[in-house]
């Protein structure tokens, strides 16, 4: 079984935040090393500094590449300038440079087939900006680098509670003009496919939230529901995608109606993430769906306010590891099923004789 362990590439994120703390705390539990082979892309020197400062009992090996990572060990690939300094809670362009270097190396080794999935620790979206990185965040960067032309979908999840976003990191004033029928349909299709292939749900039920208060109140508070969202949903229903709504976000979330669906599609960032984080901040996971690569991250940021104090909970990061493993395994099973589709055997009655007929499962 050892050779079948999933190799998880972990990017260090912002070295002045809680990234190393949650990584080291997660893998201080020996049972985590039985599930996967974790490889940190970062700095052994920085990792050792965090380990000592936070008094975390986690050992690691230094390797040149993920191909050298040993079983039942946490490994660190050095891809950061040894002179970089850790200054807890301080936004620093050098820390941003180190975060980008780790991300680039992880992507490079993923392309080489040395790791199976990527789990990213939080970055500072300001200090990482450079000529090489001009994106709002991880999601858009990874879509550009590893998407192969596919569009991504941001999903925040905890167990069966999954919230996806039509629009992500854009100003509120641009939301209404950005949302189109085509964009909603694109996100619904990705969400539907993800729920089936990545989470093994046979017939996913998706709830769609409205853009305007009270779902537009019959046009009194806006026409986007009537002119964009509902027509988009009707066309998707004709293609076999099960979607309901649009629901007013406040009543839908406040009533607990979200528990009756496999996924919820929100129109914009805070509409989806505010209730999600209120309900599942501690161990929620950010999953980037729709791409060939499996990428997850914890649902929190750099948490500068508690960096270096030993107060950060590793629960969300641990769940990000679990989700990456589960999705990768589900995709492998899906791939195997497509290569060797199950065959149905049934008898067809003809002229008082039974004829064995073989049929293959629809490949969707």
UniProtKB/Swiss-Prot annotation:
Pfam family, one: PdxA
Cellular location(s): Cytoplasm
Molecular function terms from GO: 4-hydroxythreonine-4-phosphate dehydrogenase activity; metal ion binding; NAD binding
GO biological process, one term: pyridoxine biosynthetic process
Record-listed substrate binding positions: 138-139, 277, 286, 295
Annotated positions binding a divalent metal cation: 169, 214, 269
Enzyme class, broadest EC rank: oxidoreductase
Domain of life: Bacteria
Repeat in keyword set: no
Family: Belongs to the PdxA family.
Complexes and interactors: Homodimer.
Function noted in UniProt: Catalyzes the NAD(P)-dependent oxidation of 4-(phosphooxy)-L-threonine (HTP) into 2-amino-3-oxo-4-(phosphooxy)butyric acid which spontaneously decarboxylates to form 3-amino-2-oxopropyl phosphate (AHAP).
Protein name: 4-hydroxythreonine-4-phosphate dehydrogenase
Gene source species: Bacteroides thetaiotaomicron (strain ATCC 29148 / DSM 2079 / JCM 5827 / CCUG 10774 / NCTC 10582 / VPI-5482 / E50)
Organism lineage string: Bacteria, Pseudomonadati, Bacteroidota, Bacteroidia, Bacteroidales
């Amino acid at each position: 079984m050892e050779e079948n362990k999933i190799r998880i590439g972990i990017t260090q994120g912002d070295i002045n935040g809680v990234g190393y703390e949650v990584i080291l705390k997660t893998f201080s539990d020996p049972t985590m090393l039985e599930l996967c082979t974790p490889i940190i892309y970062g700095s052994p020197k920085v990792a050792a500094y965090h380990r000592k400062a936070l008094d975390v009992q986690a050992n690691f090996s230094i390797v040149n590449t993920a191909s050298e990572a040993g079983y039942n060990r946490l490994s660190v690939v050095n891809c950061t300038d040894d002179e970089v300094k850790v200054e807890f809670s301080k936004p620093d362009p050098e820390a941003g440079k180190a975060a980008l270097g780790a991300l680039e190396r992880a992507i490079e080794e993923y392309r080489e087939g040395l790791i199976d999935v990527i789990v990213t620790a939080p970055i500072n979206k300001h200090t990482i900006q450079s000529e090489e990185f001009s994106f709002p965040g991880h999601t858009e960067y990874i879509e550009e680098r590893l998407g192969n032309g596919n569009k991504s979908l941001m999903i925040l999840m905890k167990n069966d509670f999954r919230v996806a976003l039509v629009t992500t990191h854009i100003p509120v004033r641009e939301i209404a003009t950005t949302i189109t029928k085509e964009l909603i349909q694109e996100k619904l299709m990705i969400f539907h496919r993800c729920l089936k292939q990545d989470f093994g749900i046979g017939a996913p039920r998706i709830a769609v939230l409205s853009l305007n208060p009270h779902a537009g109140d019959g046009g009194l508070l806006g026409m986007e529901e009537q002119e964009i969202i509902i027509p988009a949903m009707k066309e998707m229903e004709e293609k076999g995608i099960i979607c309901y709504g649009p629901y007013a976000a406040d009543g839908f979330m406040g009533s607990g109606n979200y528990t009756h669906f496999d996924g919820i599609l929100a129109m914009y960032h805070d509409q989806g993430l505010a209730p999600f984080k209120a309900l599942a901040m501690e161990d929620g996971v950010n999953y980037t769906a729709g791409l060939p690569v499996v990428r997850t991250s914890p649902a929190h940021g750099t948490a500068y306010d508690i960096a270096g104090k030993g107060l950060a909970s590793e629960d969300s990061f641990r769940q990000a590891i679990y989700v990456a493993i589960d999705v990768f395994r589900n995709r492998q099973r899906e791939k195997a099923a497509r290569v060797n589709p199950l065959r149905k055997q049934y008898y067809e009655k003809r002229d008082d004789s039974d004829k064995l007929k073989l049929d293959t499962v629809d490949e969707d």
